[in-house]
Amino acid sequence: MRYALGIEYDGKNYCGWQRQNNVITVQEKLEKALSKIADEKIEVVCAGRTDTGVNATNQVIHFDTEKKRKDTAWTLGVNTHLPSDVAVAWVKKVDDDFHARFSATARNYRYIIYNKPLRSAILSHGISHCHFALDENLMQQGADYLLGKHDFTSFRTVHCQSHSAVRTIKHCRVTRQGDYLVVDIKANAFLHHMVRNVVGSLMRVGQSQETPHWMKEVLLAKNRCVAGVTAPPEGLYFVDVDYPENFELPKSRLGPLFL
């Protein structure tokens, strides 16, 4: 039997999603909790691996098991074995042809910037802070140059292992909600650090250090050195995954928080 789960987590205390030796990861914690409920070793596959410090409000995973359990065992039961910063949000039994990664048609991230001169004590993590005033309209103009299918070499880390840097951005929206700027970006897939490098570059535009057209110049350069700095991980959230409708997976509120 194959199950899909919706997972949310605060990435502050984890060295990313993927299981690794000698460090704490989200995948490790989830597999241990699932294995206790199933009373057998469980391995999971996720829709998109997140880096150290990155959060998720709707990561999607799948796993296989021959053990029959009530749905509440895979939600409430698993949550009792998870730390407070990782939680199962929903469960659905799926056909064997469902694959959390390969069945996905798009991934959606949101980056949250607290844009005030002084930092917040209450929201000391889970957001990024920029004390310089940011113009969301200029940032949106710059973001529009990224829409469509392009080579995003300029926006990936030099350590990116993907064979191709070509990706298709379906939307990239910059909006302000009070003191918060939200960069909402959806693509068929993302390169290593791609979202954070895009945001770091857009922040230069938002501060009028560069014109919106500069984003197109960076894109065409295909050179990581010409783009902006990598934005911090704590403001980044994996918020949604698109799948073909026939899988009928639950849809959660994108979030995070009140957004």
UniProtKB/Swiss-Prot annotation:
The active site is at 51 (nucleophile). It is an enzyme of class 5 (isomerase). The keyword Disulfide bond does not apply. GO terms for molecular function: RNA binding; tRNA pseudouridine(38-40) synthase activity. It catalyses: uridine(38/39/40) in tRNA = pseudouridine(38/39/40) in tRNA. The keyword Oxidoreductase does not apply. Its EC number is 5.4.99.12. InterPro entries: PsdUridine_synth_cat_dom_sf (IPR020103), PsdUridine_synth_TruA (IPR001406), PsdUridine_synth_TruA_a/b_dom (IPR020097), PsdUridine_synth_TruA_C (IPR020095), TruA/RsuA/RluB/E/F_N (IPR020094). Formation of pseudouridine at positions 38, 39 and 40 in the anticodon stem and loop of transfer RNAs. This is tRNA pseudouridine synthase A. It comes from Colwellia psychrerythraea (strain 34H / ATCC BAA-681) (Vibrio psychroerythus). The gene is truA.
